[in-house]
Design a protein with these regions (language model features):
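N-terminal cysteine/histidine-rich coordination modules
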Residues: 1-33
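Hydrophobic, aromatic-lined core segments that form the binding pocket/scaffold
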Residues: 51-230
């Protein structure tokens, strides 16, 4: 069977307009041809598409996700989320007092003080912490899922996908460490709880690097041109 999938399918102005019925008719025709192509290819490979157990596949996927979430580094990332929420919940007054202090300094216009810059620095650190708080966990769960599925299904691309997700998590962890360091400079009275968070992040970083030793070297298309020094 010959398949004519080319620009000729969309050679008229009407067929290139996504709001035009002609466009969708052409796309539907290509969809049918593509399905037939897949069917023939599967037959040549001895694969019975009708024999695929979708319920079993869904169960396996659910088990993969469950196993991924149970990985020590995923559990550590989940624990970090809770610790961050606890810190913010316990320090609403501290943050408000600091804001009032900086506002007073700004109004006093005392030479040698830079309350506006200090406020921006604190806000930046807080935003970084919040931005990566959940992302680290999500990316590590995806990385774990890719690693597990790659081993189960012997698919080489999945470990690479896992490395990509792990790299994003590593970036998030290290930027979070830097942000907490900035907050520690601003709130020295919070030394104990912030150091506890930093220790947890550093331990998590070591776990991730041990499980995904190639993650740092992974090149993300559109983001990395070489090994990223974070």
């Amino acid at each position: 069977m010959t398949y004519a999938l080319s620009e000729d399918e969309f050679d008229s102005p009407q067929s290139q307009d996504i709001n035009n019925k002609v466009f969708w008719d052409k796309l539907h025709d290509i969809f049918k041809v593509t399905l037939e192509m897949v069917k023939e290819t599967a037959e040549e490979m001895g694969i019975d598409l009708d024999s695929i157990d979708h319920e079993e596949a869904a169960k396996q996927q659910e088990q993969v996700h469950k196993t991924a979430k149970e990985q020590p580094y995923c559990q550590a990332a989940l624990s970090y989320i809770k610790k961050v929420d606890s810190w913010f919940g316990s320090n609403k007054g501290l943050l408000k007092d600091k804001a009032d202090e900086l506002q007073t300094l700004a109004e006093a216009d005392i030479p040698g003080t830079r309350p506006a810059d200090e406020a921006v620095s604190i806000q930046d650190c807080l935003e970084v912490v919040r931005w990566y708080q959940h992302q680290i966990y999500v990316k590590l769960c995806r990385a774990a899922s890719g690693l597990i599925r790659g081993e189960l299904e012997d698919l080489k691309y999945l470990p690479q996908d896992a490395n990509g997700s792990a790299k994003v998590a590593i970036i998030g962890i290290e930027r979070s460490i830097a942000a907490w360091g900035g907050l520690l400079n601003q709130f020295p009275q919070q030394e104990h709880p912030i150091l506890d968070l930093l220790v947890n992040l550093k331990r998590l970083l070591r776990q991730v690097e041990a499980v995904f030793p190639d993650a740092r070297a992974f090149v993300r298309l559109g983001f990395d041109t070489a090994v990223t020094n974070i």
